């Protein structure tokens, strides 16, 4: 057993609604608003694709998700050999970390961002350098630049960031990439890209033309509503993808996952409706005075800053909403209107100054 494994723990999902009801003595329906899933679910066309092809599950899938790869490549007007798929972005992060990191290497990222960057680096005996976020919840790109040296093998930028929901602009990311050594890959994790409405959000595909070391990651788990089918991908140089492919398990994206992802990707009208609903519901949270305690969000969740996260978590639970507690606040997945209205009422009546 690797020694460094001993300092890690397996991923711990939140308690189930049944367990929470028992622990808190609740006799109400509970709704899971803790994992940033799209509660409206996937496109009906994705569901139909699953039904249509369900009898094919006795066969192994085509390796590398070739139909989906070509669909995305054609849509984005890029070489399909620049795309690698994983069973969600978790596996993409694992494959990249395994392919690149060696003992003595280091990764540089933020102190409060997606934990799988740290986790996989430690597994590979790499050093993890975490730069604190700015007070507004944004990545401190200057702070990250100051930590990059000859031992830096990977830089991770979650944009928009999970769990804060904040983002770096196109201008900020471009200025950052100008200063990063060209041999250091910068992984830009855009898992929540489809929820963004900000005009100055980076066009990372465009930036890749100037900065080939900027690698872009996206997923079907969030806006496309396919979290249970595990499909994520990275767009990088052909050389990098060739090397990552050596690490990729042979049949890592299942048949039904690929069929559903293709159908979901083709149904952009449904995606636009999801985007519209999310933007409308997100705006409701920021209409209340208490929003001064929230980080700005370009995602399908709200991060609420509070010195009393446990109390806020339990107050939201009492109105039937399971959220995610952090040391400095609570992350709330944007749900259906009636769920959001309940949570907004709790936030309006919560004592943030206690």
Curated annotation (Swiss-Prot):
Gene3D superfamilies found in the cross-reference section: Aspartate Aminotransferase, domain 1, Type I PLP-dependent aspartate aminotransferase-like (Major domain)
Keywords for this protein: Amino-acid biosynthesis, Aminotransferase, Histidine biosynthesis, Pyridoxal phosphate, Transferase
GO biological process: L-histidine biosynthetic process
Catalyzed reactions: L-histidinol phosphate + 2-oxoglutarate = 3-(imidazol-4-yl)-2-oxopropyl phosphate + L-glutamate
InterPro entries membership: Aminotrans_II_pyridoxalP_BS, Aminotransferase_I/II_large, HisP_aminotrans, HistidinolP_aminotransfase, PyrdxlP-dep_Trfase, PyrdxlP-dep_Trfase_major, PyrdxlP-dep_Trfase_small
Obligatory cofactor(s): pyridoxal 5'-phosphate
Entries under Pfam families matching the protein: Aminotran_1_2
Modified residues (N6-(pyridoxal phosphate)lysine): 222
Enzyme kind, highest EC tier: transferase
GO molecular function: histidinol-phosphate transaminase activity; pyridoxal phosphate binding
EC number: 2.6.1.9
Pathway: Amino-acid biosynthesis; L-histidine biosynthesis; L-histidine from 5-phospho-alpha-D-ribose 1-diphosphate: step 7/9
Family: Belongs to the class-II pyridoxal-phosphate-dependent aminotransferase family. Histidinol-phosphate aminotransferase subfamily.
PANTHER family according to UniProt: HISTIDINOL-PHOSPHATE AMINOTRANSFERASE, HISTIDINOL-PHOSPHATE AMINOTRANSFERASE 2
Quaternary state and interactors: Homodimer.
HAMAP family: HisC_aminotrans_2
Record-given protein name: Histidinol-phosphate aminotransferase
């Amino acid at each position: 057993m690797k020694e460094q494994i001993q300092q890690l723990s397996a991923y711990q999902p939140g308690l189930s609604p049944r367990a929470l009801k028992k622990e808190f003595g609740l006799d109400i329906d509970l709704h899971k608003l803790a994992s940033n899933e799209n509660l409206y679910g996937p496109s009906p066309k994705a569901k139909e694709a699953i039904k249509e092809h369900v009898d094919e599950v006795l066969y192994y899938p085509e390796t590398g998700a070739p139909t989906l790869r070509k669909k995305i490549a054609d849509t984005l007007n890029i070489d399909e050999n620049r795309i690698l798929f994983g069973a969600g972005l978790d596996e993409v992060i694992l494959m990249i970390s395994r392919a690149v990191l060696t003992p003595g290497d280091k990764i540089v990222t933020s102190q409060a961002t997606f934990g799988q960057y740290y986790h996989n680096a430690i597994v590979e005996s790499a050093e993890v350098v975490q730069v604190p976020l700015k007070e507004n919840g944004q990545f401190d790109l200057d702070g990250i630049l100051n930590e990059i040296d000859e031992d830096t093998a990977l830089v991770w930028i979650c944009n928009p960031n999970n769990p804060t929901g904040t983002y770096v602009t196109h201008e900020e990311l471009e200025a950052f990439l100008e200063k990063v050594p060209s041999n250091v890959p910068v992984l830009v994790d855009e898992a929540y890209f489809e929820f963004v409405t900000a005009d100055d959000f980076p066009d990372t595909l465009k930036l890749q033309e100037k900065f080939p070391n900027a690698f872009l990651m996206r997923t079907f788990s969030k806006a496309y509503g396919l979290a249970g089918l595990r499909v994520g991908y990275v767009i990088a140089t052909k050389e990098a993808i060739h090397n990552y492919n050596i690490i990729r398990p042979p049949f890592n994206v299942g048949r039904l996952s690929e069929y559903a992802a293709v159908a979901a990707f083709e149904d952009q009208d449904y995606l636009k409706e999801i985007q519209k609903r999310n933007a409308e519901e997100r705006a409701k949270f920021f209409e209340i005075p208490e929003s001064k305690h929230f980080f700005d969000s370009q995602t399908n969740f709200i991060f609420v800053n509070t010195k009393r996260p446990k109390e806020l978590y339990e107050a939201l639970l009492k109105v039937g909403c399971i959220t995610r507690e952090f040391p400095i606040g609570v992350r709330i997945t944007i749900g259906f209107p009636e769920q959001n209205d309940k949570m907004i009422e709790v936030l309006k009546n919560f004592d943030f100054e206690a």
